[in-house]
Amino acid sequence: NIIVRSIKLDKTLYKDNKNFGEAAIYFAGLIMILDGLAGAVAANTVIKTAVAMSGLTAILTWFVWGLFIYVIGVKLFPDKETKVSFKKVLTAVGFAHAPGLLRFFAVTPDLMIPIIFLTQFWIFAGLIVSTKQVLNLKSNIKSFGIVFLAFLIIAFLSISFVMSKMNALPISNIS
């Protein structure tokens, strides 16, 4: 029910407190792990991917998304009605990743790119919906801004990390 409602971008999913009970954080974590595995299955149609690492990477991604959305939306730019715990934000981020489960259907190279592209935008839309609802924001634009800023920070940090591992950062050549 939570997965279907998340895929449908049902905003009432995030307003109903019974969806955020004790087990919700574990269910959100399971969605993230399955999302990571689905991504590995999709990518495995073209290149060999470490499936076990995909689950671990998904959990790390979950915490990073949750942390940035929490800090940006709750600590830096809250609305008057924004009073939410990190756990609830983290749970909502996990629920919003349910469209990623559709990546299990990317079983041929021809399907991989369109399905990954579609599900990534779908997840982004889910993050915007969930952020607006759990942070009690008045504006869709503000919700978009919080999610987009989190995305930009994550992208910058990811690119910097990869470039540092490749010794390709401009500052890595200064001696």
Regions inferred by a protein language model and the residue ranges of each:
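Selected alpha-helical membrane-embedding segments in polytopic membrane proteins
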Residues: 1-84
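Detector for Asparagine
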Residues: 1, 17-19, 44, 136, ...
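Hydrophobic alpha-helical transmembrane segments and adjacent short intramembrane/lumenal linkers
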Residues: 70-158
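Alpha-helix boundary/capping detector
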Residues: 29, 40, 115-116, 157-158, ...
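Detector for methionine-enriched segments
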Residues: 32, 53, 112, 123, ...
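Juxtamembrane "helix-exit" motif on the non-cytosolic side of transmembrane helices
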Residues: 39-46, 106-107, 162-165
